[in-house]
């Protein structure tokens, strides 16, 4: 995902937001708090399992998947949260996927999208998300804080995504409780787990860290387990012949 590509996505999002209606705020779906769960379950590397039909880097991944069944399989096998892609243009997702999955599982759901406006946050909450994604690279620090504060005031938790030390420092200044490190390089589109390992020395006590992207095997998970509370895994689970077995391989015992 080059910066040019990120810019294309954000231009598309701006067009979508312009046409988007401001929804009335509906009651927040009840489930456990992700940060609290991570705090109380640090003896295991937790898996955030993603429902993703396609991506710009890989193209179609699994277009025929029964999204609700996939999500329920994740839940049954101990996923801590389900991440749902809702971007239609670049990831072939849909807000309805979030709504359907959130109505059929009891664990938290994450709205995985490029959020740049309060209207998107309300839509996510109304569709059943209890956590949203905010990407440091997509927002000014001032705008990031505005959206973070707005989401938390609505009772949502926020996964703040970073890619390098400068962005990690922004997340720390923000006071983010749950911080993601995306292993995808925004300028080359390459992925490297070393990104997560290199940032680990800068992690702070009292926060919870999630490694995202390029995590496929138990070996990958073992490499990250000493530093992270959880991992976000999409493609490996969407392509797995045995989803339950793959999740178990990724749930590294840290005890």
UniProtKB/Swiss-Prot annotation:
Keywords: Amino-acid biosynthesis, Aromatic amino acid biosynthesis, Decarboxylase, Lyase, Tryptophan biosynthesis. It catalyses: 1-(2-carboxyphenylamino)-1-deoxy-D-ribulose 5-phosphate + H(+) = (1S,2R)-1-C-(indol-3-yl)glycerol 3-phosphate + CO2 + H2O. Its EC number is 4.1.1.48. Pathway: Amino-acid biosynthesis; L-tryptophan biosynthesis; L-tryptophan from chorismate: step 4/5. GO terms for biological process: L-tryptophan biosynthetic process. Pfam families: IGPS (PF00218). Belongs to the TrpC family. This is Indole-3-glycerol phosphate synthase. It comes from Streptococcus pneumoniae (strain Taiwan19F-14).
């Amino acid at each position: 995902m080059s910066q040019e590509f990120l810019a294309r996505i954000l231009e598309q999002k701006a067009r979508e937001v312009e046409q988007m209606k401001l929804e009335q705020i509906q009651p927040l779906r009840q489930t456990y708090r992700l940060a609290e769960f991570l705090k109380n379950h640090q003896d295991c590397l937790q898996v955030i399992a993603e429902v993703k039909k396609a991506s710009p880097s890989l193209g179609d991944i699994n277009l025929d998947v029964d999204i609700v069944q996939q999500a329920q399989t994740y839940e049954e096998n101990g996923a801590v949260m389900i991440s749902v892609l809702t971007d239609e243009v670049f990831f072939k997702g849909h807000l309805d996927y979030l709504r359907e999955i959130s109505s059929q599982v009891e664990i938290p759901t994450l709205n995985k999208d490029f959020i740049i406006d309060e209207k998107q946050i309300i839509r996510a909450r109304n569709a059943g998300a209890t956590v949203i994604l905010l990407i440091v690279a997509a927002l000014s620090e001032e705008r990031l804080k505005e959206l973070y504060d707005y989401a938390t005031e609505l009772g949502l938790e926020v996964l703040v995504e970073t890619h390098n030390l400068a962005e990690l420092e922004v997340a720390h200044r923000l006071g983010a409780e749950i911080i993601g490190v995306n292993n995808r390089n925004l300028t080359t589109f390459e992925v490297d787990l070393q990104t997560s390992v290199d940032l680990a020395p800068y992690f702070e006590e009292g926060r919870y860290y999630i490694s995202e992207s390029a995590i496929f095997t138990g070996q990958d998970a073992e490499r990250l387990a000493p530093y992270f509370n959880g991992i976000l895994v999409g493609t490996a689970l969407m392509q797995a012949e045995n989803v339950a077995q793959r999740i178990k391989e990724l749930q590294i015992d840290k005890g």
